[in-house]
Amino acid sequence: PALRIIPLAHSRATGMMDLADLKRKLSAETAAVYFENPSYLGSIETEGDTIAELAHQCGALLVVGADPSSCGVMAPPSRYGCDLVCGDIQALGMHMHYGGGLGGFIGCRDEERFVMEYPFRLFGIAETSVPGEWGFGDVAYSRTSFAQREQGKEFVGTAAALWGITAGVYLSLMGPKGMRELGATIMQKSQYAAARLSEIPGV
């Protein structure tokens, strides 16, 4: 197969990655190490910098799946050495309904080896001839399906682009302060729910 996924052990008590198991399974053939922070079970990985160091030592990338709702209160993946970050933007103002309201995001360092592989169109910002004015436009157009048809790296549909606008409006309305408040509220409610559930025998 072109790709082989090797699961890693984790602590049942904390949900954190078993670093000893990671060390055993890393090799020169490892392309990337991936983990979610927070995970789908709600655990928070606190050893991100160590995981990044171990991955980079064998030439692998560190890829982190992040919930944007958590980014207002948690350290961003870039802080602990992440090469690529990805996630779902459904939580950014999109109503839940049958089979819709979906979109994702990818982030990376400003390096050509990453950016040129993005599976969608790229837009850049530059100064115009009018002082203080900025313009936006397609970047690296030659890599798109418009230029190369089926050979292009980019593939994006109208629906995904529209949900991207929804997420952008949501973020602009929330602002940094609103995103911090959102993250703090989610953490507080989660801890409250866990405390109440733990009062039930057998839970």
Where are these regions (language model features)?
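General beta-strand structural signal in soluble alpha/beta enzymes
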Residues: I6-L8, F35, A55, L62-A66, ...
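Conserved active-site segment immediately N-terminal to the catalytic lysine
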Residues: S78-G93
